[in-house]
Amino acid sequence: MEGLAGYVYKAASEGKVLTLAALLLNRSESDIRYLLGYVSQQGGQRSTPLIIAARNGHAKVVRLLLEHYRVQTQQTGTVRFDGYVIDGATALWCAAGAGHFEVVKLLVSHGANVNHTTVTNSTPLRAACFDGRLDIVKYLVENNANISIANKYDNTCLMIAAYKGHTDVVRYLLEQRADPNAKAHCGATALHFAAEAGHIDIVKELIKWRAAIVVNGHGMTPLKVAAESCKADVVELLLSHADCDRRSRIEALELLGASFANDRENYDIMKTYHYLYLAMLERFQDGDNILEKEVLPPIHAYGNRTECRNPQELEAIRQDRDALHMEGLIVRERILGADNIDVSHPIIYRGAVYADNMEFEQCIKLWLHALHLRQKGNRNTHKDLLRFAQVFSQMIHLNEAVKAPDIECVLRCSVLEIEQSMNRVKNISDADVHSAMDNYECNLYTFLYLVCISTKTQCSEEDQCRINKQIYNLIHLDPRTREGFTLLHLAVNSNTPVDDFHTNDVCSFPNALVTKLLLDCGAEVNAVDNEGNSALHIIVQYNRPISDFLTLHSIIISLVEAGAHTDMTNKQNKTPLDKSTTGVSEILLKTQMKMSLKCLAARAVRANDINYQDQIPRTLEEFVGFH
């Protein structure tokens, strides 16, 4: 019956109404109920024949299912729309989101709930507003769709239509008394969303309906949001309409100019100078009431520059692009505040431009500053840390010197991030745990890349001690992957993933130097993964024993010298020798096997199934268990 359900689903998906009818012909009522309620899974999506037919706009199939087979309209599934995964979507939600008006009308006329919500509290009306289908929006509202239902982030239909730029939908919702001043969870209103996206007609419409100028949760007004997003026409419109004081006006112009200096999509150094100069003139227009800047203390990452405080200082750097770039970063940090989520993006962009031009020292200064800002704001920094591994690898590959203090600094930040991500994984909801675990494991791999890079860097004894301290700090936390791998397991494993953007030019696993360094910093040599395998169990399965003999040999020697038990058994009762997949690793292992009397006794206890629990000291129980 499951195979037949697959054919039924395929026919519904492809709009083959005659094929579908033939497949269901002469079936019992219970069989039909099973076939039309069967949830098919495909590419991360879960849907029934009705849901997929509605999603794909097959009105004839939908009509057949509703009128002839009385399929329930409230069936729910999981679908993908514009890169988003929508859980708990009905056929009506799918039809509205995909713009299939005929299907929408069919479903509503057969009793579909127009206010049914998905898991994230999204309604069919919201889906239609996202897509900008005014005809569907009107039809749903005329059939009692509630325009005030917000999603789980308190984001309303008006907000999504404003952000997506659907002016006609925005106008209609406002005419239907949608609240222009409703606030999302982040404190933003529809005006914030329209201003950020640069939809000037929608901004005008919202102003006409008396949308209030308020600050969001990050202390940003729509004017500031538009300036930060380089939406000059919106800024100029709001400045002409909004009742803002002189200081707010100046800061908006400064922020707009500063943002043009370091925005990948909107970079325009001429506009940077233009708006910064306009703002400066506003500061000095009243000689009796000059608005002096409250400049930030010099910041190392910005070349210890001090922000221009008068028109003459600004004119002096007019032709100096690099100075204007730094001026832009300084101005943004002053106006937005160091804890603002958007401050770091242009810093990272400017650093990347330096890296592309082989100006690595300046790149690293900026990226370290951005990393500290993001960690101070408790932001997820796994991408930032990986970026350092990539640029350090690129430098080594190009024979550029990497400074040990820079590596130590990033390692320290990496330890902090891994500790925080371990806590996130423990305390996060089941729905988000997979993503959190991915980020956490990515951080572990990045840490290993950084350790590997440190082994290829000239270090003083003091620098090496500082690096080793960070490695020790992380080992002490005992971070584990899903498989229970420790850092040592990962260091000896050929399956440990290596990032392919510059990093794989320098880093590879198994890695003898990384293994030795981890052991020197206190890694537990006999720690086991979820399958009971020690690092020695892993390395003897390395499948390049000839071409990479030195690595295999060095790692086995390091592990054994650090106290690895060569007779330790995993959950399959296999020793490293049993797990050895090549003659070379077998020979290497045998030459290192020095069985102690203690090990022989433990193996005898296990081999003869002698009860030892609670019969010997607790410290020995674990030891016997290993054997």
Curated annotation (Swiss-Prot):
Main location: cytoplasm
Residues engaged in binding Zn(2+) 1: 185
Coiled-coil intervals, chain numbering: none
GO CC annotation: Cul2-RING ubiquitin ligase complex; cytoplasm; cytosol; nucleoplasm; nucleus; ubiquitin ligase complex
Pathway field: Protein modification; protein ubiquitination
UniProt tissue specificity: Present in adult testis (at protein level).
ANK repeat boundaries on the chain: 45-74, 87-116, 120-149, 153-182, 186-215, 218-248, 483-527, 531-568
Compartments, as annotated in UniProt: Cytoplasm; Nucleus
Pfam family, one: Ank_2
Site (Cleavage): 342-343
GO biological process terms, semicolon-separated: apoptotic process; branching involved in prostate gland morphogenesis; epithelial cell maturation; epithelial cell maturation involved in prostate gland development; proteasome-mediated ubiquitin-dependent protein catabolic process; protein ubiquitination; regulation of DNA damage checkpoint; regulation of extrinsic apoptotic signaling pathway via death domain receptors
Keywords: ANK repeat, Apoptosis, Cytoplasm, Metal-binding, Nucleus, Repeat, TPR repeat, Ubl conjugation pathway, Zinc
GO molecular function annotations of the record: death receptor binding; metal ion binding; ubiquitin-like ligase-substrate adaptor activity
Residues that hold Zn(2+) according to the record: 186
TPR repeat windows: 344-377
Residue numbers binding Zn(2+) 2: 186, 218
The protein's assembly and partners: Component of a CRL2 E3 ubiquitin-protein ligase complex, also named ECS (Elongin BC-CUL2/5-SOCS-box protein) complex, composed of CUL2, Elongin BC (ELOB and ELOC), RBX1 and substrate-specific adapter FEM1B. Homooligomer. Interacts with PPM1F and PHTF1. Interacts with the death domain of FAS/TNFRSF6 and TNFRSF1A. Interacts with CHEK1. Interacts with NKX3-1.
Similarity comment: family membership: Belongs to the fem-1 family.
Functional description taken from the UniProt entry: Substrate-recognition component of a Cul2-RING (CRL2) E3 ubiquitin-protein ligase complex of the DesCEND (destruction via C-end degrons) pathway, which recognizes a C-degron located at the extreme C terminus of target proteins, leading to their ubiquitination and degradation. The C-degron recognized by the DesCEND pathway is usually a motif of less than ten residues and can be present in full-length proteins, truncated proteins or proteolytically cleaved forms.
Name of this protein: Protein fem-1 homolog B
Gene: Fem1b
